[in-house]
Curated annotation (Swiss-Prot):
Protein name: tRNA (guanine-N(7)-)-methyltransferase
Main enzyme class: transferase
Binding site for S-adenosyl-L-methionine: 61, 86, 113, 135
Alphabetic keyword roster: Methyltransferase, S-adenosyl-L-methionine, Transferase, tRNA processing
Active site: 135
Gene3D superfamilies cross-referenced by the UniProt entry: Vaccinia Virus protein VP39
Catalytic activity: guanosine(46) in tRNA + S-adenosyl-L-methionine = N(7)-methylguanosine(46) in tRNA + S-adenosyl-L-homocysteine
Cross-referenced Pfam families: Methyltransf_4
Source organism per UniProt: Azorhizobium caulinodans (strain ATCC 43989 / DSM 5975 / JCM 20966 / LMG 6465 / NBRC 14845 / NCIMB 13405 / ORS 571)
Enzyme Commission number: 2.1.1.33
SUPFAM superfamilies registered for this protein in UniProt: S-adenosyl-L-methionine-dependent methyltransferases
Binding site for substrate: 139, 171, 209-212
Amino acid sequence: MTALSETEHKGAFYGRRVGKTLRQGQQQALARTLPRYLIDLPTVAEPAALFPCPVDEIRLEIGFGGGEHLLSEAKRFPRAGYIGIEPFLNGMAKAVLELDLAPQENVRLFNLDAALLLARLPEGSVSQVELLYPDPWPKRRHWKRRFVRPDNLDLLARALKPGGVFRFASDVPDYVDWTLREVRAHPAFRWTQTRADDWRTPYEGWPGTRYEAKAIAAGRVPTYLSFARV
């Protein structure tokens, strides 16, 4: 599969890029700290070289929100290089503010469409991809905007190494069912869970997220899916 160009994939990201006005501290952190962590497409041919510290593997989180899960995992696994992908500026600002206060050398950030990065990374260079509480696009006419769809699964399969892991968490039953159908139908992936407790139980070391806490408080039940690259 050839890499996508920015022109070819123009408009593939759906949703707002900016929400509420950023606080002064967030604006200052973006200006001061984001350039240190931000990567661009021409630099990803050698992913391990993106990090100033030695890393044994590369992991991605697509749509990291405020970054609490991304940064928690990076602390747990200091020998893994984490690339967080978030086009939404407000989420990026929250993560960068935390990095401004407590730098983490095994973290790098990407602020464009995840598909562009997945297409440029070397084949089989990623050990884990996480998609946690993505926008479910609940209206039927918007389902084509969901990230989990055949073209993006092709890109995930390309980037993941054999045995690599794709994780998906959501509190929207329809999107969970959709993801199970789409991923199980793709020849490059295998669903690794066999019991209900497997997908009802958070992943090992799961720190939770602010969004998840709100969902549970509202009575919604999260599901945690895991797939392996065959």
